[in-house]
UniProtKB/Swiss-Prot annotation:
Class of this enzyme: hydrolase
Protein name, entry field: Crossover junction endodeoxyribonuclease RuvC
Protein family (similarity comment): Belongs to the RuvC family.
Organism of origin: Neisseria gonorrhoeae (strain ATCC 700825 / FA 1090)
Principal localisation: cytoplasm
Length: 184
């Protein structure tokens, strides 16, 4: 019997940070939890209060669900430098929470393109396509919010990259084939 590995995926955001937790056991994968951390709308972007909310809530998620591994979506460089800086602060807050709870992150990060490629098979996939594939891959009865689905997609990407495609043989609900590590 294979050991269960619990993975936390985080999609950092200045207003909403999404998270998703999955378990990988041998050839099976299971949904554990997901959600969105919303920072106070009445606070200016980006204040210590917003950072504190992200750190506190990610810390609570880690304390409750006890993941063994974590991965974070990498911040992209935006046309607007202020937006990039705010996303970087949200990412830093999430990483600080993980490190403060002694979670071995190894700073595993994936670009949005890598996440979409791993989950949907197309790096330019729309958010709705990511949500749809997360529902299919995890056998969910409902559709998670977009940011929570992104967190789950980050966790799935980490599982695919680090626990092998063999762990995800049942990910193929539509008869797609895996070629060069991608669904075709």
């Amino acid at each position: 019997m294979s050991a269960t590995v619990r993975i936390l995926g985080i999609d950092p955001g200045s207003r909403v940070t999404g998270f998703g937790i999955i378990d990988v056991r041998g050839r099976d994968h299971f949904y554990v939890a997901s959600g969105c951390i919303k920072t106070p709308a009445d606070e200016p972007l980006f204040t210590a209060d917003r950072i504190a909310v992200i750190v506190r809530h990610i810390g609570e998620v880690v304390a409750v669900y006890k993941p063994q591994q974590a991965a974070v979506e990498q911040v992209f460089v935006n046309v607007n430098p202020a937006s990039t800086l705010m996303l970087g602060q949200a990412r830093g807050a999430a990483l600080a929470a993980l490190v403060s709870h002694k979670l071995p992150v190894s700073f595993t990060e994936y670009t949005a393109l890598q996440v979409k490629q791993a989950v949907v098979g197309k790096g330019k996939a729309a958010k709705e396509q990511v949500q749809h594939m997360v529902v299919q891959m995890l056998g969910l009865s409902g559709t998670p919010q977009a940011d929570a689905a992104d967190g789950l997609a980050v966790a799935l990407t980490h599982a695919l990259r680090n626990h092998g495609l063999a762990a995800f043989t049942k990910l193929n609900p539509s008869g797609m084939q895996v070629k060069r590590g991608r669904f075709q």
